[in-house]
Design a protein with these regions (language model features):
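A short, glycine/small-residue-rich beta-strand->loop->alpha-helix junction that serves as a flexible
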Residues: 6-15
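A short beta-strand-loop structural module common to alpha/beta enzyme folds
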Residues: 29-40
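Short, flexible loop/turn elements at secondary-structure junctions
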Residues: 8-9, 37, 121
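Histidine-anchored nucleotide/phosphate-binding helix
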Residues: 14-25
Length: 149
């Protein structure tokens, strides 16, 4: 199982999530995405996309703004991190990529049965096919219908 916590704005979240999906497909692993609603990207994943994997929404809008959601988000992160055989922080991911490239990172992921990865960038090379799974949600299609037709 690969658990990804994509960070740092919508673009970086899409890079992290898309590359984690590609790695999960390559390794035949289940993917779980810890989607953070935060000041820079305060939107639920299901409001944007119809995704083919499990998404767990957590809030990082601060204790003063959303105390219950903030506490729940912290509990969910602890729960899922505890399930992992290994936890990689953003800096760990970048250090592995710098030293060993994407192949080195893939080897680390492949070695662990359950890995929790916090990342603000891609975990592998991406191409247009890597993003093909991103389908707009019904709400986005409805709102964008005048633009799409």
């Amino acid at each position: 199982m690969i658990i990804i916590e994509p960070c740092a704005g919508l673009g970086n979240k899409l890079l992290g999530m898309s590359s984690a999906y590609a790695v999960a497909q390559k390794l035949n692993r289940e993917l779980i995405v810890m989607w953070k609603r935060e000041v820079g990207c305060n939107v639920k994943a299901e409001e944007l996309f119809d995704l083919p994997f499990r998404v767990i929404e957590i809030s990082e809008n601060g204790y003063s703004k959303e105390p219950v959601a903030h506490f729940r988000g912290n509990q969910l992160k602890k729960k899922w991190r505890a399930k992992a055989d290994r936890f990689l922080e953003c800096g760990d991911v970048e250090a592995i990529k710098k030293q060993k490239g994407y192949e080195g990172l893939l080897a680390v992921i492949e070695k662990e049965p359950v890995i929790y990865i916090k990342s603000f960038g891609p975990l592998c090379e991406l191409d247009a096919a890597s993003l093909a799974f991103l389908k707009p949600s019904a709400g986005i299609l409805q709102k964008g219908e005048p633009l799409f037709s």
